[in-house]
């Protein structure tokens, strides 16, 4: 049986469809320096030599700091972490109009993303005829079966799959009204949403002269993430916390425009890191504190960070992601999760919600019972 990792809180701290982009690999990245890789999408792809973000120290990868947070650390800045914990304590049940309602209100926690995100969240459990079906492995099922879950917590599904037009980095894209419609069908208004998990590593993909390289990929992810956060506040104005995750390893070197490939899956984690750093450093474009001016973003931090190098355990915590164990391979793109992969990723997210001070005040029932 494959070992399942119990991740401690320091890690927590964090797919989908893309537009086509291609180009030659960067000559200064030894892992990408060879001529264009033979395009392939299967389990035969071995370790690339690229390091997980969590395993990199100062100036440790192409001159860029590693670590999930500034100063090559995997632990959040103390002031920023304390702010997140304080915001978490301010989250209360809201009625349809967004006003506090401790009796009939809801604490709504949902996601931004599409098929891979939905698999982790709900496991396609409302359609057992789908190719991938994880009815008990998913986050929603496991969270709602906790004895100490907050009884006012609501975990609705949002977007289920890409329609070919979705772009969550564009505030005018149909993704947003479609997400609102999906929530409305479950009795949820935009004013009730307070927490989101954004599993969206396709932010900003597009063609360019540098091809598949760092820092270009990371900058695309960072800038797209900022635009997404602005759109979130436009459509869900009471959102206070957003957890950000980049994608797991992709057993594909073919940028075919359908899903995230390598090395973008690897590089995009730096983009999330840089967006969080911008907020920690006080960038007005990501301000969450009304005492410091106009609020332009929710408070952000890492959700689960999934990337490992083609099944090689991470030095930081031993996490592995393997093909075919964790990846659905039958009639697949080798990117969607298998039920075992859903179980692993949902477990990481659930573990964070049960331990992270930015989550426990609203996720768990303070009385200890449901």
Please describe what each predicted stretch is.
Residues 2-8, 23-112, 116-134, 366-370:
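N-terminal secretory targeting modules
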Residues 10-23:
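Bacterial N-terminal signal peptides
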Residues 63, 70-71, 106-215:
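Conserved SGNH/GDSL esterase-like catalytic core that processes O-acyl groups on lipids
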Residues 105-108, 148-155, 190-195, 235-242, ...:
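Loop/turn elements at helix/coil->beta-strand transitions in domains of secreted/extracellular proteins
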Residues 117, 125-129, 184, 201, ...:
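Sec-exported extracytoplasmic/periplasmic mature domains
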Residues 119, 123, 131-134, 138, ...:
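Extracytoplasmic/secreted proteins, especially bacterial periplasmic and envelope-associated proteins
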Residues 172-190, 199-231, 236, 251-271:
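Active-site cleft segment of glycoside hydrolase catalytic domains centered on the general acid/base Glu
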Residues 249-370:
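Catalytic His-Asp segment of secreted/periplasmic serine-dependent ester chemistry enzymes
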